[in-house]
Amino acid sequence: MESTSNLIKNANEFLDSLNEINDKLKEVVGKIKNKTIDKTKLSDIILTLEKNLEILQDLKSKMEFLEFDSPYKNVGKLKGGYDSEGLQEIASYSTYLRRIASEKKGILERVRHALVAHKIALAHLTEDIGNINLPPNLPLDGSYKKIMFEFPPYLVTTYKEFLDILEPKGRGILTSYTISLIVIDKGKREFKRIKVEDKNYEKYIKEKFGNAIITSIKRNFSKNKIIDDQYVRRVLAIGYLNTYKDEIEKAINEKIDKLLNEEEKKYLNRYLELCLLFREEADISGGILDVRCMEERKLKELELKEILEKEGLYRDGEPIEPLKKAIKIKNELSKKISKDILIKRFSEDVFKFYLYKTPDERARSNLFPSIMITPQRGFLSWMSVDGINCVDVLDLKFKLEEELPKYQIPLKNIGGVALYLIHDWDAVERFNFKKKDIEDLLKKIALIEPIKEILKDKNVDVSKLEKFGKVKKEKTKKFLDLLSGL
């Protein structure tokens, strides 16, 4: 086993050597999109990523064996009496140990982020439903903070809000309601306790039990995370923001162009130019701020205010009214638009992941490592895909995945069935399912009574399924009933 110092040195050198791989990936992805890619070049970049992945896995294993993940465990734990000279030596040695411990922790964190980024990049390059735009924008060298530091402040805010979606705070995600109620049936009162995942539980109860009386409601929360691994969450958040930052910036500018008059736009553009110039000058040290440069930063801020005053953009230390209004509008728009676009793009990919893949395929895929295989409705409430009720479609698909194996019916194309039953044939074709395949599947399940009960429970129009069962004979129905009893 190599020494700690050599391991840290070799890991840093290897990670630094990955700086150019993002540019190579960008070139390859551009050729894939233009359909001019040479298969050899694609194979070469995939092979490079696979080799890097092996090296990163080896580095991670060695570091964890040497307890890089708990580097401060024995720092400062010395027993016995020492004279003043001995205490000075101990203090000096403790400082050295803390520095080494910090290096251990830092390099292991970087290796873990790089490892996750490589897994995700490979999956999105090689799987049919992968987002080909994502791999070049992932922190493949593990330096996710370096990418984040280059983001404007509103994107950093969006990054944090996105992590909050993937890692809920407080009590967690509201997943269901446990409801106690009194049902009146033929003049008799009957007490029931039911569990409902739909937040519109009153409508559900009315449709299922009629005029029932709710006596108590308990909200059930889960602290589980839709993506369990913290490194995956960070890498995906950085990767998606980096991928769509230009689209976000364009959408913000288009909106600002409509809302501000020419004077306000002129003031805002000049203000942003000066702020950018100030930031570039302040960032010469690579973004590392310590106590010594805090004063210098404050002086720079005062200098910026003086420049803004001279330019006529500030008065008495405050923005002039047209600029103040423009800044406020830009800040509000930037936060909203960046979050909306990020959620939309991420939702599209996650929705397709759940829609197309079976539970086994989801468990094996690295498109979204450590993602929940079959999440409850509450974990999907953030999803947003134009024209699609993501939560209802996926919730129904998951219920069908649970039921259909009892009848020896394969799970391929179940996503298309869920799209048809919740929406229509246009939605089925939009996601590239073949109508004939879905019709054949609908005919197989049309006479399965438990499926109809699931649809009724989900407030789905059962007649959309039943019309495919009219061609079935009675003996087919009996055969399916026999299968369900096996």
From Swiss-Prot:
It holds the Pfam family DUF530. InterPro entries: DUF530 (IPR007503). This is Uncharacterized protein MJ1110.
